[in-house]
């Protein structure tokens, strides 16, 4: 069984002073970096960095050719690692991610990145729908608080609601510490 790591949208706009600052992105990125390093040290060449580039300027962040859209320094890809550019929350939608995974015979994916409630959720569900055994490293993900009408949902609750919904049916959800013990 061949395994790939998918690193989603760990980009500058999600960090302090970015245009769409998340809660605790530094902690999530540091945990993602540990998982990336594990892949690199264990001769796992199947690392896919996904970068969201806004196709509509109205989005207000991840605008083309801006510092905010660049991959954060904590998780910079190496020259030989795969780069995927996306324009939608689902990392598979209108990208070559699936074809590249199939070319390499990948059957299992490990997912880390941002935002838990959008791009992580959409990508994990799509991966399972496409037949990949999927693991989500939950503490290598970050999100933000959400609101609906007069209700505000804190980021931690948003995060755990989404990872709880994904756990079992869609993914094996584990911590970076548990992953690194393997």
Regions found by a protein language model. Name each.
Residues 7, 45-52, 137:
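Short beta-strand segments at enzyme active-site cores
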Residues 14-15, 50-55, 73-83:
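Short, basic/glycine-rich phosphate-binding loops at helix/coil junctions
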Residues 2-4, 31-42, 61-182:
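Active-site-adjacent betaalpha module
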Residues 14-18, 56-59, 144-147:
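A short acidic, helix-capping loop that chelates divalent metal ions and anchors anionic groups
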Residues 19-39, 44-48:
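A short alpha/beta connector and helix-capping loop motif
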Residues 5-20:
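Generic N-terminal amphipathic, Lys/Arg-enriched alpha-helix
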């Amino acid at each position: 069984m061949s395994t790939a790591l998918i690193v989603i949208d760990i980009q500058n706009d999600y960090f302090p002073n970015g245009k769409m600052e998340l809660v605790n992105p530094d902690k999530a990125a540091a945990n993602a970096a540990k998982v990336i390093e594990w892949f690199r040290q264990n001769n796992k060449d199947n690392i896919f960095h996904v970068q969201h580039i806004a196709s509509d300027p109205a989005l207000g962040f991840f605008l083309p050719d801006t510092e905010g859209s660049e991959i954060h320094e904590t998780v910079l890809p190496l020259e030989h690692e795969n780069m995927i550019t996306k324009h939608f929350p689902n990392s598979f939608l209108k990208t070559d991610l699936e074809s590249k995974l199939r070319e390499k015979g990948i059957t299992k994916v490990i997912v880390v990145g941002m935002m838990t409630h959008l791009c992580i959720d959409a990508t994990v569900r799509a991966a399972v729908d496409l037949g990949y055994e999927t693991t989500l490293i939950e503490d290598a993900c970050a999100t933000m608080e959400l609101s609906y009408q007069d209700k505000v949902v804190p980021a931690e609750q948003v995060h755990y609601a989404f990872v709880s919904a994904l756990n079992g049916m869609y993914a094996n959800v584990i911590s970076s510490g548990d992953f690194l013990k393997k």
